[in-house]
């Protein structure tokens, strides 16, 4: 898998998986690559969130599968967020296989526990952050997630006596509603708002009676 990503990076192929390939290789080599820069965010902003803020990996994987299984398993490029979710799931699957192989070949239970805890605290946390970020961008909108991260970063760095008691909450609804059409296609449209039509003002002057024509009296 890493050979595939390595070829993409060295060949500078302009494809949607280019950034995700640099992400996977960055984790492998320890390079200072921030995969959130192209989305207007950063590792630093995500690290302001506490560790227990991010849901469990199984819950995130189940959510991604339930909402976007068709897009993730298809061959079409839907968005950079879908591509990042794909690569995060692939990286975590490879790490899970590595842990399973180590568990079956290492006899010491203490060593196995240390390895599993280390993977969960390092790579596992990065996958949790990545899945949460991109799922939230697809659910609430990228701009809303950016504002939330900045607001939370300001709140957590402000001394307790000078900040509100409650932290910001990511609760804003998305700007565009995604509607699934027949045949699997999706269309996004903004919610319509009905504006009341102005009522016609009735004239205050008395109504004039129509004068009958002379021919009507004949």
UniProtKB/Swiss-Prot annotation:
Region called HBEAG, residue ranges: 26-28
Protein name (database record): External core antigen
Signal peptide region: 1-19
Subunit annotation: Homodimerizes.
Family: Belongs to the orthohepadnavirus precore antigen family.
Record key words, sorted: Disulfide bond, Host nucleus, Host-virus interaction, Repeat, Secreted, Signal, Viral immunoevasion
Main function: May regulate immune response to the intracellular capsid in acting as a T-cell tolerogen, by having an immunoregulatory effect which prevents destruction of infected cells by cytotoxic T-cells. This immune regulation may predispose to chronicity during perinatal infections and prevent severe liver injury during adult infections.
Record localization: Secreted; Host nucleus
Main location: secreted
Gene Ontology CC, one term: host cell cytoplasm
A GO molecular function held by the record: structural molecule activity
Pfam families (UniProt xref): Hep_core_N, Hepatitis_core
Biased composition (Basic residues): 180-211
Bilayer-spanning residue ranges: none
SUPFAM superfamilies reported in the protein's UniProt record: Hepatitis B viral capsid (hbcag) (SSF47852)
Keyword Cell membrane: no
């Amino acid at each position: 898998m890493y050979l595939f990503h390595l070829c993409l990076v060295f060949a500078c192929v302009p494809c949607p998986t280019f950034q995700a390939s640099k992400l996977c290789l960055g984790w492998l080599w320890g390079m200072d690559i921030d995969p959130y820069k192209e989305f207007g965010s950063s590792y630093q902003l995500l690290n302001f969130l506490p560790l227990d803020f991010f849901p469990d990996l199984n819950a995130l994987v189940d959510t991604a599968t339930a909402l976007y299984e068709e897009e993730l398993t298809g061959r079409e490029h839907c968005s950079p967020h879908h591509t990042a979710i794909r690569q995060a799931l692939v990286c975590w699957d490879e790490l899970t296989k590595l842990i399973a192989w180590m568990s079956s070949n290492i006899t010491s239970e203490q060593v196995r526990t240390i390895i599993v805890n280390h993977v969960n605290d390092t790579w596992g946390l990065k996958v949790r952050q990545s899945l949460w970020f991109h799922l939230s961008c697809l659910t609430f909108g990228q701009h809303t997630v950016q504002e939330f991260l900045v607001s939370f970063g300001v709140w957590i760095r402000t001394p307790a006596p000078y900040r509100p008691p409650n932290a910001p909450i990511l609760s804003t609804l998305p700007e565009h509603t995604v509607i699934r059409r027949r045949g699997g296609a999706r269309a996004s449209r903004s919610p319509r708002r009905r504006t009341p039509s102005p009522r016609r003002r009735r004239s205050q002057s008395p109504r004039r009676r129509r004068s009958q024509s002379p021919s009507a009296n004949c």
